[in-house]
Amino acid sequence: MSKATCSFEGCHSAVITINDDNIINLPEQVHSEFKLLENRTMRDATPSESNFLVVPDVWDFDNVGVSREIPSSILGDLSDKSDFVFEYGNSSWKIKKCLKYLICADCDKGPIGIICKVQDQTKNEERVLHLLSLRSLQIMGRN
């Protein structure tokens, strides 16, 4: 199993063990839209999609910090963003609103992910998920 760690020099704190079944792809523009940190080596690769780890519960992390609520003036309304739809748990989910940022709990740097309100596109049910940007972290032990 691979581990996601903080990518900042002098930190490298373990953030979470990665479950490959919970990795989703979102469009490339998600990093600029949500103002997420990008690991320099990953940013230079310029892939067309970005991998995120879906984490259902904050207690599933080994070590993560959470910011204050993100003012809507920073990110705006996402209801018209049809690009931010992903498949997870046999459902199609749409990101409705970003609530808070995820940061490294040891060095307080980031943001390395977002806590989002998402909506199931078929059942019309809403829930909160943690989306951890794998491009914002260093991945150890990946084959």
UniProtKB/Swiss-Prot annotation:
Keywords: Guanine-nucleotide releasing factor, Metal-binding, Protein transport, Transport, Zinc. Pfam families: Mss4 (PF04421). Guanine-nucleotide-releasing protein that acts on SEC4. Might play a general role in vesicular transport. Zn(2+) binds at residues 6, 11, 104, 107. One of its GO terms (molecular function) is guanyl-nucleotide exchange factor activity. It comes from Saccharomyces cerevisiae (strain ATCC 204508 / S288c) (Baker's yeast). Coiled coil: none annotated. Belongs to the DSS4/MSS4 family. InterPro entries: Mss4, Mss4-like_sf, Mss4/transl-control_tumour. It comes from the Eukaryota. This is Protein DSS4. The keyword Transport applies. One of its GO terms (cellular component) is membrane. Residues 1-131 form the MSS4 domain. Present with 1500 molecules/cell in log phase SD medium. One of its GO terms (biological process) is small GTPase-mediated signal transduction.
